[in-house]
């Protein structure tokens, strides 16, 4: 092989190696995320109550817990906290209460307890999205009877439960097959392999400061 050819080959190999190293070490440039739109929740500073319409279900594995009574309360942030030029507006809410609950497993009675700091945030859009934050260990289902089980939601960290909001008279907050991380402990009949549950519920929201007004989410 001629000296000129060997030199060209060596230069080509070095260039290829340099390109290979560059492709490995050069940082990837991510596409910019779209900015969230503006959100305003009104009336500012008004208290509200969310009341379950129909039934709420929490399904873990083959077991479904159904409750027909659930209530939570909260307050729209006072101005200017009820507005966000580029993102959601968040409101603290009381831990939702759940009662009149039944299990899909015969002979098993569930009890639902909630605790901690809960919140709900609204992001204007089409549709309007709602995110309920469950604090760590903030919802626990305990069953007695033929199967003694404990289901703990958000077992290791706060969990974001996605839903939607619809303005109206009254407005509604809906969760459809929303995924919630869980751990399940117990013996025979308990779905101990389940790591997530599906939550379904529709809440009607009323303005308790002035019942003639409606809680509204807009731009």
Regions picked out by a protein language model, each given a short descriptive name:
Residues 69-169:
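Predominantly extracellular/secreted and cell-surface proteins with exposed
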Residues 146, 150-174, 195-203, 208-217:
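Elongated scaffolding segments in large macromolecular assemblies
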């Amino acid at each position: 092989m001629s000296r000129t050819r060997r030199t060209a080959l060596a230069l080509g190999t070095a260039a290829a190696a340099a390109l290979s190293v560059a492709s490995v070490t050069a940082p990837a440039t991510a596409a910019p995320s779209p900015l969230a739109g503006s959100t305003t929740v009104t009336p500012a500073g008004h208290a509200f109550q969310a009341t379950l319409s129909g039934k709420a279900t929490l399904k873990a594995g083959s077991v479904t817990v159904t409750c027909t009574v659930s209530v939570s309360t909260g307050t729209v942030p006072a101005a200017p906290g009820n507005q966000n030029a580029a993102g959601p507006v968040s409101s603290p809410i009381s831990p939702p209460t759940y009662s009149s609950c039944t299990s899909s497993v015969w002979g098993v009675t569930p009890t639902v307890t909630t605790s901690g700091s809960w919140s709900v945030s609204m992001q204007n859009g089409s549709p309007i999205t709602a995110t309920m934050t469950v604090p760590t260990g903030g919802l626990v289902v305990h069953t007695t009877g033929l199967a003694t089980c404990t289901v703990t939601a958000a077992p290791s960290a706060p969990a974001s439960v996605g839903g939607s909001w619809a303005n109206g008279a009254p407005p509604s907050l809906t969760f459809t097959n929303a995924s919630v991380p869980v751990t399940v402990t117990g013996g025979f009949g308990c779905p101990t392999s389940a790591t997530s549950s599906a939550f379904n519920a529709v809440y009607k929201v009323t303005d308790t400061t002035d019942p003639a007004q409606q809680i509204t989410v807009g731009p």
